[in-house]
From Swiss-Prot:
Produces ATP from ADP in the presence of a proton gradient across the membrane. The catalytic sites are hosted primarily by the beta subunits. The keyword Transport applies. This is ATP synthase subunit beta, chloroplastic. One of its GO terms (molecular function) is ATP binding. PANTHER family: ATP SYNTHASE (PTHR15184), ATP SYNTHASE SUBUNIT BETA, MITOCHONDRIAL (PTHR15184:SF71). ATP binds at G172, G173, A174, G175, V176, G177, K178, T179. It is a peripheral membrane protein. F-type ATPases have 2 components, CF(1) - the catalytic core - and CF(0) - the membrane proton channel. CF(1) has five subunits: alpha(3), beta(3), gamma(1), delta(1), epsilon(1). CF(0) has four main subunits: a(1), b(1), b'(1) and c(9-12). It catalyses: ATP + H2O + 4 H(+)(in) = ADP + phosphate + 5 H(+)(out). Keywords: ATP synthesis, ATP-binding, CF(1), Chloroplast, Hydrogen ion transport, Ion transport, Membrane, Nucleotide-binding, Plastid, Thylakoid, Translocase, Transport. PROSITE patterns: ATPASE_ALPHA_BETA. InterPro entries: AAA+_ATPase (IPR003593), ATP-synt_VA_C (IPR055190), ATP_synth_F1_bsu (IPR005722), ATPase_a/bsu_AS (IPR020003), ATPase_alpha/beta_chains (IPR050053), ATPase_F1/V1/A1_a/bsu_N (IPR004100), ATPase_F1/V1/A1_a/bsu_N_sf (IPR036121), ATPase_F1/V1/A1_a/bsu_nucl-bd (IPR000194).
Amino acid sequence: MRTNPTTSRPGVSTIEEKSVGRIDQIIGPVLDITFPPGKLPYIYNALIVKSRDTADKQINVTCEVQQLLGNNRVRAVAMSATDGLMRGMEVIDTGTPLSVPVGGATLGRIFNVLGEPIDNLGPVDTSATFPIHRSAPAFIELDTKLSIFETGIKVVDLLAPYRRGGKIGLFGGAGVGKTVLIMELINNIAKAHGGVSVFGGVGERTREGNDLYMEMKESGVINEKNIEESKVALVYGQMNEPPGARMRVGLTALTMAEYFRDVNKQDVLLFIDNIFRFVQAGSEVSALLGRMPSAVGYQPTLSTEMGSLQERITSTKKGSITSIQAVYVPADDLTDPAPATTFAHLDATTVLSRGLASKGIYPAVDPLDSTSTMLQPRIVGNEHYETAQRVKETLQRYKELQDIIAILGLDELSEEDRLTVARARKIERFLSQPFFVAEVFTGSPGKYVGLAETIRGFQLILSGELDGLPEQAFYLVGNIDEASTKAINLEEESKLKK
């Protein structure tokens, strides 16, 4: 993409050289602007409207050029509300695309789509900025090696492992522990990989964004006393904002993540909540830009817009961006163009189950519904693959037997099936784990469990070596040795009670 360089001559301010246009037409968030001949801005250039409204209030609206209409007119989408704008107002072409602050100074802070801090903690202490529209890494720069991204969370690492530099879809309703899982991943990547995280709130509720910020401060993911030691940068474009902001806030978050990957050479975790809202915002402005709607009223450029975002999320030889994207499925229709286009880019899916959450098993990741393209013998090795398959088989058999148990009871099952049920219940409880970020609420210290320890633990349960231990011993522990210790403690407690 070409940029419009602004040259500076001695004694002449750069603002005077920038071309100035005037607003011709305003339709919601879309503006038509006329510029002098030969002074047209480039596609994606940022335009600024600075003026005063009829009540003499300051107006400062940033727009992004989307189309060149001919006759020296351009069509732009506003990044904030267009209230108070009038035809004839002056519009300044900045000569560059929207650029946002990047680097360590962004950690612990909250930004809007323009990269302006909105947390009342003063300006950001950095001079480094990146444009939000950047090319995806060249093919030669990509790291093609398939490697597992260890999270330290047993159920994820064993049954639906994440790919380093991959894209993961997070499916879950309200109140099943999505926020806590997100915060634990942010915490673990910082501790185990020395990495940082960027959270992009795309079209989410303002209340949820505020709750997440407060919980992050409470759990230590954001360090209030020493903000530089925080592990995450937050970028919000909430539901109440115009579609222009919601359409671009994902790119703002991604740009901040790219700096950590390309310049700081770090492993970065990028959260996008919700990727559906990114598509929805594009669909809102598409008709106003004069495009013919496609299937189900979505924009005809849906695949291109999704691809331009997703292709930038990848591993290079310098570092990686691993992305976890919350996916809303409208009316539970997986064939809807928005989720269907998203699925094409995902390497793994993590499904949170309300049934498990109601049993008190956290993280409430459904072991049978969650999937990963990485769970193949040639990638994870035979030992990991076979253990995962046997765990799934045991849980699947338990699921099939539950109706029989509910009607006839456990005693009517064969000896083999009773053993399967006992082991499945132990596996189900062993898939739970105390989280570091939940220490504040539970009082139990968090546990990071390495992949080798996870595999060993499930192998011991499947082999029958631990059939003698009570199933409570496997609930909310880290590795398998802790389960054995907990069993001894439970036995001693029961003796004391007697």
